[in-house]
Swiss-Prot record:
GO biological process, alphabetically ordered: mRNA processing; mRNA transport; regulation of translation
Biased composition annotated in UniProt, kind: Polar residues: 1-26
Positions of the RRM domain: 52-130, 140-217, 233-310, 336-460
Native source species: Aspergillus fumigatus (strain ATCC MYA-4609 / CBS 101355 / FGSC A1100 / Af293)
Main location: cytoplasm
Cellular compartments annotated: Cytoplasm; Nucleus
All residue ranges annotated as the PABC domain in the record: 648-725
TM annotation in the entry: none
UniProt GO molecular function: mRNA 3'-UTR binding; poly(A) binding; poly(U) RNA binding
Name this polypeptide is given: Polyadenylate-binding protein, cytoplasmic and nuclear
Gly residues composition bias: residue spans: 605-631
Top-rank lineage group of the source organism: Eukaryota
Biased composition (Basic and acidic residues): 379-417, 737-753
Length: 753
C-alpha cells in the first residue's frame, strides 16, 4: 500500500535575482508521508535563465539562514536564503529555499551538497517548482515498500540512481525519525521509472524482498479500497473454542461456497489462539457466511464472523469510536463539572463534598493529590535488616569453621501508589447545569479556612490554552494598533526575514559594525558604518550636547521609527496599549528639568510641566525658548505641525470630543495614572492600560468617583493575578463524572491577597 505524494511548498518569487516573500511561511508543516515532488525539468524556466532556486528539506528546527549561507556560499554566489517558518509561532517548518544567481551554481550545489549533514541531519536538496500541477503529478513517481530500517534517503538514492535522473528521493519516517519501511523515488521521466520497477521489483535489499511499483494517489487508492470493501471475500472469525481442529473449522464454512483457504491462528506451542480466517472464491459466499454464522453459538461460545480488516483500518475505526465516546462524555458533562482551586491542605474529598452539597446532588467530588510510589517495607524493617546483617558478619568472623546461617528470606518489595499532599485544587461534578451554576455563583471567592476559593466550570486543557492564546494575541494586536495610532503612523507590516548575499539589495558588507544581514523592513533604521549596533544615523532633534548626555550619544528609535521617549511609560514599560506617557518625569531636581536628558522628545502632542532645557544645552527643538535662569520653566507656543493637548485636570466629555480618539485615551490615561499609582504603585501602568479598554464615559465617571475607581482597580488586579497564576496550570476536562488526575493543574498555588 502506498501513501500519497505530498506537495513541495512554493518557492520565493524571484525577480532579477531578488526573491519576494510569499505566504509559504504561513502554512503549517504537513505530515511527511511521501516524497515531495519536484519539477519535472532539471532547470528553471527559460524566462529566468540566470537564476536557480533550490528546495532544501529535512532540516533541523534550529537551522538558521546564516548556517545555510555558510554552506551554500561555498558553491557560488547566493542571491538569497529563507528558512520557512510558522506564521504564528515563528518555528522552523523544516525546509528552506536557496536562490543562486545562475543555474550552474544550483546544479553544482544539488550534486555536491545533497544529503550533507546539517546539525546532524542529512539535508535533501531538489529543484523548487512553483507550479502545483507539476508538483502533484505522479508521472515518474515510484513507490517502494518493505524496506529495511537501515536504508535511509541516501542509500535509497544510490540504489535507484542507476536507472535515470532522480528529482527527489525520500524514505518515510515517523515522528521519532525511524523508517516506516517504505519510500518514494521521483524520476525525471516515466521511462526511467518503468526501468527501475522492472529491475528492482522483487529483489533483495538488505536481505528483505522489496516491492517496487508505480505510485497511486490517495484518491485513487481510496476509491479502490472502497470497492474492495464492498466485494470482500476474506472472512475473520473469533471466539473459536480451542478444541476445534483445522478440519472442523473448514467444514463449518464449506456449506457457503468454495473455499480457497481456511486457517486457524496458533501460538508457538501449536495451541489455537481462538481466531482464524476463511477466504472464499466469491463475495456472495463470504457474505452468506457472515450473515448466517455471526453470533452463532458453537461449543458453548458465540462466534464473531465479519469482514477481515487490515491493521491500520481497525486502528482507524477504534480511534473514531474512542473519539466519538470522548465527545459524548464531554457533551454529557458539559456545564456540570466544576474546577475548584486555592484549597487548604486539610480539605479532603469528604470535606469538599460537604462544602458544595447544599447546592445540589453531587455525583463526584475529588481533591487532587500527589502520588508517591513506595515499597511495602517500612524504614524500621530496613533498620532491623541492617542490624541482623551486621550480627551475621560478626558471627562469621568468630566462627569461621562453621557454615554461615542461611539468611531469612527478604520481604518482597512490591511497589504501590499512595496519596500524598494535596495539590490545592479539585473537582466537583453536579447532576445538572443549574446546580453547578448556582455553586459557582455562591462559592466563587468565598473564604474557606482563610483562603478565597476560585470556582469555575472545568475546561479541557487544550480548550483553555487556545482561549488564552487567542486573548493574548488579540490584546497584542490592540496594543500595536493603539501604539501606531498614538504615534500617527500606519500599521507596521513585518516582512519575513530573508538573508541576502553580497551585492544583493539590503546587504551590509562584512566588517562594518551595526549592519543587519536582512532586507530593510518598513519602519526599520539600518545601522551606520562604523557605529554602534542600532545607532541612529545623524543627530537627534534638539540634541546639541548639554549636561545630561554627550553630543554623540544618540537615542535610537524603536523598530517602528518612533523615539523611545514617545513609547515608554513609567519604569520603562512599553507604551503599547495606552500606558500613560511620562511627560512629567524629570531626571534630577527642579521643575525646570536640570537633570533631564537633553533631546529626549516627549510623547507626541504632550508637553509636561517645566518643559525646558538642560543646563548648558541648546533649547529642545520644538519646545519653548529659555527665559533666563537654568532649569526655569517657560511657556511657549507649540511647534508647527504638533497639536496641543489640553491639560488633564478637570476632564469633561466636551473636552474629549475636541481632540482625536487616540489623544482622548492618552488624556484619560494621564488623568487616571496618578490615582491608580496611589493605590497600586508597582502595577499602575498595567492596570491603567487595562482600564483604558473601557468606554470613555465610564472612565470619566471613574475620575470623579474614587470608590468606583478603587473597585475597578481591585477587579483588574484580580484578573491580572489569575492570568499570572494560570500560566503554567491546566484544568481537567469534564470527560467523566469522576475528574481525572492526568488533566490536573500544577500543585503550587499562591494565596490571593
Amino acid at each position: 500500500m502506498s501513501a500519497e505524494v505530498s506537495t513541495t511548498p512554493a518557492a520565493d518569487n524571484t525577480v532579477n535575482g531578488t526573491p519576494e516573500a510569499t505566504n509559504a511561511a504561513a502554512t503549517s508543516a504537513p505530515e511527511v508521508t511521501a516524497v515531495e515532488s519536484a519539477s519535472p525539468s532539471t532547470t528553471p524556466s527559460a524566462s529566468q535563465p540566470h537564476s536557480a532556486s533550490l528546495y532544501v528539506g529535512e532540516l533541523d528546527p534550529s537551522v538558521t539562514e546564516a548556517m545555510l549561507y555558510e554552506l551554500f556560499s561555498s558553491i557560488g554566489q547566493v542571491a538569497s536564503i529563507r528558512v520557512c517558518r510558522d506564521a504564528v509561532t515563528r518555528r522552523s517548518l523544516g525546509y528552506a529555499y536557496v536562490n543562486y544567481n545562475n543555474t550552474a551554481d544550483g546544479e553544482r550545489a544539488l550534486e555536491d551538497l545533497n544529503y550533507t549533514l546539517i546539525k546532524g541531519k542529512p539535508c535533501r536538496i531538489m529543484w523548487s517548482q512553483r507550479d502545483p500541477a507539476l508538483r502533484k503529478t505522479g508521472q515518474g513517481n515510484v513507490f517502494i515498500k518493505n524496506l529495511d530500517a537501515a536504508i535511509d534517503n541516501k542509500a535509497l538514492h544510490d540504489t535507484f540512481a542507476a536507472f535515470g535522473n532522480i528529482l527527489s528521493c525520500k524514505v518515510a519516517q515517523d515522528e521519532f525519525g525511524n523508517s516506516k519501511g517504505y519510500g518514494f523515488v521521483h524520476y525525471e521521466t516515466a521511462e526511467a521509472a518503468n526501468n527501475a520497477i522492472k529491475h528492482v521489483n522483487g529483489m533483495l535489499l538488505n536481505d528483505k524482498k522489496v516491492f517496487v511499483g508505480h505510485h497511486i494517489s490517495k484518491k485513487d487508492r481510496q476509491s479502490k479500497f472502497e470497492e474492495m470493501k464492498a466485494n470482500f471475500t476474506n472472512v475473520y472469525i473469533k471466539n473459536i473454542d480451542q478444541e476445534v481442529t483445522d478440519e472442523e473449522f473448514r467444514k463449518m464454512f464449506e456449506k457457503f461456497g468454495e473455499i480457497t483457504s481456511a486457517t486457524l491462528s496458533r501460538d508457538q506451542e501449536g495451541k489455537s489462539r481462538g481466531f482464524g480466517f476463511v477466504n472464499f472464491s466469491t463475495h456472495d459466499s463470504a457474505q452468506a457466511a457472515v450473515d448466517e454464522m455471526n453470533d452463532k453459538e458453537i461449543k458453548g461460545q458465540k462466534l464473531y464472523v465479519g469482514r477481515a480488516q487490515k491493521k491500520h483500518e481497525r486502528e482507524e475505526e477504534l480511534r473514531k469510536q474512542y473519539e466519538a465516546a470522548r465527545l459524548e462524555k464531554a457533551s454529557k458533562y458539559q456545564g456540570v463539572n466544576l474546577y475548584v482551586k486555592n484549597l487548604t491542605d486539610d480539605v479532603d474529598d469528604e470535606k469538599l463534598r460537604e462544602l458544595f452539597s447544599p447546592f445540589g446532588t453531587i455525583t463526584s467530588a475529588k481533591v487532587m493529590r500527589d502520588t508517591v510510589t513506595t515499597g511495602e517495607t517500612s524504614e524500621s524493617e530496613k533498620e532491623k535488616e541492617k542490624e541482623s546483617n551486621k550480627e551475621n558478619e560478626k558471627e562469621g568472623e568468630e566462627k569461621t569453621e562453621e557454615k554461615p546461617k542461611e539468611s531469612e528470606e527478604e520481604p518482597k518489595k512490591t511497589e504501590k501508589k499512595i496519596l500524598g499532599k494535596s495539590k490545592g485544587f479539585g473537582f466537583v461534578c453536579f447532576s445538572s447545569p443549574d446546580e453547578a451554576s448556582k455553586a459557582v455563583t455562591e462559592m466563587n471567592q468565598r473564604m474557606v479556612n482563610g483562603k478565597p476559593l476560585y470556582v469555575a466550570l472545568a475546561q479541557r486543557k487544550d480548550v483553555r490554552r487556545s482561549q488564552l492564546e487567542a486573548s493574548i494575541q488579540a490584546r497584542n494586536t490592540i496594543r500595536q494598533q493603539q501604539a501606531a495610532a498614538a504615534a500617527g503612523m500606519p500599521q507596521p507590516y513585518m516582512q519575513p526575514a530573508v538573508f541576502y548575499g553580497p551585492g544583493q539589495q539590503g546587504f551590509i558588507p562584512a566588517g562594518q559594525r551595526g549592519g543587519m544581514p536582512f532586507a530593510p523592513q518598513p519602519g526599520m533604521v539600518m545601522g551606520i558604518p562604523g557605529g554602534r549596533p542600532g545607532q541612529y544615523p545623524g543627530p537627534f532633534p534638539g540634541q546639541q550636547g548639554g549636561r545630561g548626555m554627550g553630543p554623540n550619544q544618540q537615542i535610537p528609535p524603536n523598530f517602528q521609527g518612533i523615539p523611545m521617549g514617545a513609547m515608554q511609560g513609567p519604569g520603562g514599560i512599553p507604551n503599547g496599549m495606552g500606558y500613560p506617557q511620562m511627560a512629567q518625569v524629570q531626571f534630577g531636581r527642579g521643575a525646570g528639568g536640570r537633570g533631564q536628558v537633553p533631546g529626549m522628545p516627549m510623547g507626541q502632542g504632550i508637553r509636561g510641566p517645566g518643559y525646558g532645557q538642560g543646563r548648558g544645552g541648546a533649547p529642545v527643538q520644538g519646545g519653548p525658548r529659555p527665559q533666563g535662569g537654568r532649569g526655569q520653566p517657560a511657556a511657549a507656543p507649540p511647534a508647527a505641525g504638533r497639536e496641543e493637548v489640553p491639560a488633564t485636570g478637570g476632564l469633561t466629555a466636551q473636552t474629549l470630543s475636541a481632540v482625536p480618539p487616540p489623544q482622548q485615551k492618552q488624556m484619560l490615561g494621564e488623568a487616571l495614572y496618578p490615582k491608580i499609582q496611589a493605590q497600586q504603585p508597582e502595577l499602575a501602568g498595567k492596570i491603567t492600560g487595562m482600564l483604558l479598554e473601557m468606554d470613555n464615559n465610564e472612565l470619566l465617571g471613574l475620575l470623579e468617583d474614587e470608590e468606583a475607581l478603587r473597585a475597578k482597580v481591585d477587579e483588574a488586579l484580580s484578573v491580572y493575578d489569575e492570568y499570572m497564576k494560570n500560566k503554567g496550570e491546566g484544568e481537567a476536562p469534564a470527560e467523566s463524572a469522576k475528574p481525572k488526575e492526568d488533566a490536573a493543574e500544577t500543585a503550587t498555588e499562591e494565596n490571593k491577597s
